[in-house]
Amino acid sequence: VQECVSEFISFITSEASERCHQEKRKTINGEDILFAMSTLGFDSYVEPLKLYLQKFREAMKGEKGIGGTVTTGDGLGEDLAEEPFTSQIPAGLITTDGQQQNVMVYTTSYQQISGVQQIQFS
């Protein structure tokens, strides 16, 4: 299962990275991931994820605290109330467009956002 998940993430990330490259950007954002999912045939997940992303950004908006920033798709930084990253997982090397990059994956848990249902993958 882990191999399949890794391949899926690489598949989506590669498509999102290609879009960023075409638009001469270096950072993949949520909209790039959603675009990639739609392009690759995962349309049924795009709308619920758009809603979740919107609700997540609304929940993060206005929280203030440690001085860290979150960059949203509109390019605006937002202050965070708490340290958002609770652990780091070294992800090794991911190949995108023929180049290898060192990547650090940050994980955390957030409260359930009201009005958003969890997505069940099957």
From Swiss-Prot:
The lineage of its organism: Eukaryota, Metazoa, Chordata, Craniata, Vertebrata. Belongs to the NFYB/HAP3 subunit family. GO terms for molecular function: DNA-binding transcription activator activity, RNA polymerase II-specific; protein heterodimerization activity; RNA polymerase II cis-regulatory region sequence-specific DNA binding. InterPro entries: CBFA_NFYB_domain (IPR003958), Histone-fold (IPR009072), Transc_fact_NFYB/HAP3 (IPR027113), Transcrpt_fac_NFYB/HAP3_CS (IPR003956). GO terms for cellular component: CCAAT-binding factor complex. Component of the sequence-specific heterotrimeric transcription factor (NF-Y) which specifically recognizes a 5'-CCAAT-3' box motif found in the promoters of its target genes. NF-Y can function as both an activator and a repressor, depending on its interacting cofactors. Residues 58-122 are annotated as: C domain. SUPFAM superfamilies: Histone-fold. Heterotrimeric transcription factor composed of three components, NF-YA, NF-YB and NF-YC. NF-YB and NF-YC must interact and dimerize for NF-YA association and DNA binding. Residues 1-12 are annotated as: Subunit association domain (SAD). This is Nuclear transcription factor Y subunit beta. Keywords: Activator, DNA-binding, Nucleus, Transcription, Transcription regulation. Can be divided into 3 domains: the weakly conserved A domain, the highly conserved B domain thought to be involved in subunit interaction and DNA binding, and the Glu-rich C domain. Residues 1-57 are annotated as: B domain. Its main location: nucleus. It is found in: Nucleus.
